[in-house]
Amino acid sequence: MVKIDCIILLLIMACGCNLSEKRPQIQDVQGKQILNSDNIWLSHEHILVDFIGVANIQPETWNHDSIIKEITPYFEELKAFNVKYFVDATPNYLGRDALLLEKIAIKTGVRIITNTGLYGVGNNKYIPQYALDLTAEELSEIWINEYKYGIHKTSVKPGFVKIGIDVADSLHPMHQKLVKAAALTHLKTGLTIASHTGKAKGLWPQLEILKETGVSPASFIWVHAQAEDNNDSYLKAAEMGCWISLDGVGWELEKHIEKLLFAKRNGILDRFLISHDAGWYDPQKEIQTIKPFTTIFTQLLPELKSHGFTDDEIKLLLRVNPSKAFAIEIRKYPFDKRAKQLE
């Protein structure tokens, strides 16, 4: 009888493990976490950014203690608003520092998510020479290895892919390569792709590359979508399954309110993310001018409520949508958005 009970217990434990593995997960700087839709997210922010460019950037000169002392008060402010997840969208060669993010996460208790990928904005100012020479397949192997083994010989692993393109009549060949490499990385890892894009003119060719590579638009976040003037582009992007990120709340409010009202009227709030694109510590400045990460809570949400937004709609923007957007899940083209829902 004891032997039978032990076997039953082992079967129950095995089933529990399998169920746990199938539930959506996120990768933050401290490890993988099982997700639900009850946590508050800031889905596009920055802790440190260094615009000096790939030729001159010197991460080894950054004083972690000084940076942590400067940035911690802004994280302390988040406790009043119960922020659980903080997505640091700073890419490699623009200020990504995995160990710094890990230290801040441990100190503040906020779960920070970092990225792999490369940033082509600014005529490839932040693209290292090796990336210009490699194929998309070779680039993707580097990014996949960061997800498997950690960033720069650390235990910190990325929770999404961050790329960036310049908007033009046609994508620069390097930027086409970045998008394809991101798509290939997604197919191997399930990491969501967040692309600095801006106007919709730069979105459609990226989604076409994803489609050609066999990746669903549901794996893709249209970053800085507030730059688009034609709101009908949001209808098209939402219909395709793309995530639409209005992430400049730290810099401007009225445009974000107008666009969120458009999304509400047209029934597409379930594809929208909101964030500040705020911060950040700049190693090139002696005196820092850091923007807080709280404007959503102190200014935007009261305005949205005054315009008739319900608690459920606000929960959608700050909890449900980002949980789904950053869930690690391979989403091949075509993708049934109803196929997998968070519990």
Q: Over which residues does each language-model region extend?
A:
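Histidine/acidic-residue-rich catalytic or RNA/ligand-binding cores of hydrolases
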Residues: 51-55, 98, 124, 203-209, ...
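Divalent metal-coordination and catalytic microenvironments
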Residues: 44, 86, 186, 244, ...
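Active-site gating/metal-coordination segments in enzymes
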Residues: 103-106, 111-113, 117-187, 243, ...
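Mid-to-C-terminal alpha-helical segments outside catalytic/metal-binding sites
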Residues: 13, 23-31, 295-343
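Catalytic pocket-lining loop regions of alpha/beta-barrel enzymes
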Residues: 183, 187-262
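Bacterial Sec-dependent signal peptides at the C-terminal "C-region" and cleavage site
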Residues: 1-3, 9-24
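Alpha-helical scaffold segments that flank or form the walls of functional sites
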Residues: 39-43, 48, 56-111, 137-156
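Short acidic/histidine-rich active-site segments
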Residues: 194-196, 247-249, 268-290
